[in-house]
A protein has these predicted regions:
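C-terminal non-catalytic scaffold/interaction domains in large multidomain proteins
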Residues: 1-223
Length: 223
C-alpha cells in the first residue's frame, strides 16, 4: 500500500506480488518462470514438491509458482503439491491410443463418464506397460497424465473424466443424478450401486448424499 502510494507508476501491483514496470510484463515474466520450473524438474528427473520449488525460487509465493504451471502446456500436476513436466513422460502413439481406448470403453459403459479410480483399475487389469514406464502408482497420477494428454478431448475435474459437454457443472451430485437418470425418487441401494461402480470414496459419497437430501425428502427408510 505504501509503495503504491509513493510509486504508482513504477510497479505493476498484484495481490501477492509486484513487478517493476521497466522489465517484462507479467505474461513474459511468467513465461520465464515456466521455463525455469521446467528446467528444474528436468534436472531433478522426477516430479518435484511445491516446497522444493519454493526453495529453488526464493521469494516467490504459492500463486506466483502455481500460475505459470497452470499456464504452461509442458507443466502439470502430478499429485497433491507435486508437479511434473511433459519431458518426463514416456508415451508413444500406441500407449496414447491404448489409454484413449480404455477411457472410451469405460465411458461407453457409463453414459460418457469415467472416474480416476475406474481408469487406474482398468489399466492395471490390462497390464499397461506405460504405468511402469512413467512411474504411475495411483489414480491421481494417471488422472493428471490423462488430463495432460487429452485435455482437448474430454472434460476433467478430479476425480471425474467426462465426455465433452455432458455437464455444464461437473460435480459428484450432478453426475450421480445423471447416472440415476434424474429420478423423481431413488433408493439408497440404487445410489450405493452407483457409488460402488464409479469407485467414489466413502467421504465423497456421504457428502453427495447429504446434498441430494436437500432436494429430495425421505418417504421410507431406503428412499
Amino acid at each position: 500500500g505504501v509503495l503504491m502510494l509513493y510509486y504508482p507508476e513504477e510497479y505493476n501491483y498484484k495481490r501477492d506480488y509486484l513487478i517493476k514496470n521497466d522489465i517484462d510484463n507479467l505474461e513474459n515474466t511468467s513465461l520465464k518462470i515456466n521455463e525455469r520450473i521446467r528446467e528444474f524438474i528436468i534436472k531433478k528427473g522426477r516430479p518435484v514438491h511445491k516446497n522444493e520449488l519454493k526453495q529453488e525460487f526464493r521469494g516467490f509465493s504459492d500463486i506466483m509458482l502455481l500460475y505459470p504451471i497452470l499456464a504452461d502446456p509442458y507443466l502439470f500436476k502430478w499429485e497433491y503439491n507435486y508437479y511434473s513436466c511433459k519431458d518426463l513422460l514416456h508415451f508413444d502413439e500406441n500407449d496414447i491410443n491404448l489409454l484413449r481406448k480404455i477411457i472410451e470403453n469405460i465411458m461407453n459403459d457409463n453414459r460418457g463418464y469415467c472416474s480416476d479410480t475406474m481408469l487406474y483399475n482398468s489399466t492395471l487389469k490390462n497390464k499397461c506397460s506405460f504405468l511402469e514406464k512413467n512411474n504411475i502408482k495411483s489414480p491421481m497420477n494417471l488422472f493428471y497424465v490423462a488430463n495432460h494428454l487429452f485435455y482437448d478431448e474430454y472434460d476433467f475435474r478430479r476425480p471425474h473424466i467426462c465426455k465433452k459437454g455432458i455437464f455444464e457443472n461437473i460435480s459428484v451430485k450432478n453426475i450421480a443424478l445423471y447416472l440415476l437418470n434424474n429420478p423423481e425418487e431413488f433408493s439408497y441401494q440404487e445410489y450405493s450401486k452407483i457409488v460402488d461402480k464409479m469407485k467414489w470414496s466413502i467421504v465423497t459419497s456421504g457428502m453427495v448424499l447429504s446434498n441430494l437430501e436437500e432436494e429430495y425428502y425421505r418417504n421410507s427408510k431406503d428412499k
